[in-house]
Amino acid sequence: MTRRSFLAAACLPAFAQDFVTLPPLKANDRIAYGKAAQQFGDLFLPHGNGPHPAVIFIHGGFWRNAYTLEHASHLCAALARAGAAVWNLEYRRLGDPGADWAGISDDIVHGAEHLVPVANRYNLDLKRVIAAGHSAGGQLALWLAAQMAVDLRGVVPLAAISDLRRAYALQLGGGVVGELLGGSPDRVPQRYAAADPMELLPISPPQRVLHGTADNIVPIDLSQRFAKASKNAKLVALPGAGHFDLIDPRSKIWPKVQENILRWQF
């Protein structure tokens, strides 16, 4: 964990600190998809020769560089144990050079597209690929699905910031949505139209929208609004679950989360 990540974790509630400060698990391989230091992915592989289904996973952290892909490593390892390869994407985040919305979204597309050469090398089944993401990563997973840059069987946003206008109104993350997009919905409506999952509907791949009812970081209201607006989404409310329970394999709800992530792949 970097010093920046440690300081960011110290600002979280105690239950969240317990999770995000866990020592990260080592992936089978780390593969660059670009020249910037943040343009890489960690690949977690299941046992066996394959071909393996694959999950493109996008971590959260309010799009800020204080949070890295490392805190998603336990989720990735758990999914690999269950039989899926996981391509855990890192990407430029706010605070990194070139990390405005254009740079961040560009990284997500290029990182996802790089799954093709990765699949050829590691015998992954490109007909059984889904995207999943947590918090800000859930927004990016939905955005990726809307671009149709890669063929996805489904998309699973976990506690996602799936309504950027609502997130701006609530000033989530200290007003991070305005920082990400360079202003309010009234000031830069075209940027919200390009980035907000609510404004990108309909999204073709089916969506399983998971959210904890006790999430005090990203309220379930955002997922409820998105699932209601989407004709291709099902909301899965997880009673009593907090924000980080959805990516913590030690949590009571993890079996339900894993089931929904892998439902289209086996």
Where are these regions (language model features)?
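N-terminal cap/lid segment of alpha/beta-hydrolase-fold proteins
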Residues: D18-G48
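Short beta-strand/loop motif that positions the catalytic acidic residue
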Residues: V209-H211, D215
